[in-house]
Regions:
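Conserved ABC ATPase signature
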Residues: 32-36
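Conserved ABC ATPase "signature" region
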Residues: 1-28
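Helical segment within the ABC ATPase nucleotide-binding domain
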Residues: 72-84
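Hydrophobic anchor residue at the start of the ABC signature
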Residues: 46
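Catalytic Walker B motif of ABC-type/P-loop ATPase nucleotide-binding domains
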Residues: 57-61
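Conserved catalytic motifs of ABC-family nucleotide-binding domains
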Residues: 53
C-alpha cells in the first residue's frame, strides 16, 4: 500500500496480488517486512520495485537469498520486462545467473568500467560471459569495447 500511495498508483491491486502470488508471498500479506526471512524480504523488495511498472529498473544482486523457484521466476520477469521495452539493469557477482539473459554487459575492474560487451557482437564467439569476464579482468586494458 505504501508504494502504491508513494507513486500515486490507481488500479494496482490486481497487479499487486499477481506479483505476490508469483513470488509465493500471498500468505504473507499481513506481515511486516522484519517478520520475513531474508529471501522473502528480497522477493518483497522485487515486488515493490515492479509495482509502479517502471520503464527502467535497477536490480542490485537480486538473486541473493532467493530459493531456486524464485530465481527461475525472477529470470522470467527479466525476460518479460525486456520484451515489453523496459530497460533492465542488473548488478551481480553471480555471472552465470545472467548467461542467457544479457544483451549488454559492463564489466567492472577496480571500480571502473573495463569493458562494454554487446552480445550481438559475439555471435561467432562461443565464450561464456564468465570466460569474457575473466579474460577482461585478468590483465586486459581498461575501457575497451568488445
Amino acid at each position: 500500500e505504501f508504494i502504491a500511495r508513494a507513486y500515486k498508483l490507481k488500479d494496482y491491486k490486481a497487479y499487486k496480488d499477481a506479483l505476490l502470488e508469483r513470488f509465493d508471498l500471498t500468505d504473507k500479506k499481513k506481515k511486516f517486512g522484519d517478520e520475513l526471512s531474508k529471501g522473502m524480504q528480497q522477493k518483497l523488495s522485487i515486488c515493490c520495485g515492479l509495482l509502479p511498472r517502471p520503464r527502467l529498473v535497477l536490480f542490485d544482486e537480486p538473486m541473493i537469498g532467493l530459493d531456486p523457484h524464485a530465481i527461475k521466476e525472477l529470470k522470467k520477469v527479466f525476460e518479460e520486462l525486456r520484451d515489453s521495452g523496459c530497460m533492465v539493469l542488473v548488478s551481480t557477482h553471480m555471472i552465470d545467473s545472467m548467461e542467457e539473459l544479457w544483451d549488454t554487459t559492463y564489466i567492472m575492474k577496480q571500480g571502473r568500467v573495463a569493458a562494454v560487451v554487446e552480445r550481438e557482437n559475439l555471435k561467432d564467439n562461443h565464450k561464456s560471459l564468465e570466460d569474457i569476464f575473466f579474460e577482461i579482468t585478468e590483465g586486459a586494458a581498461l575501457e575497451r569495447e568488445v
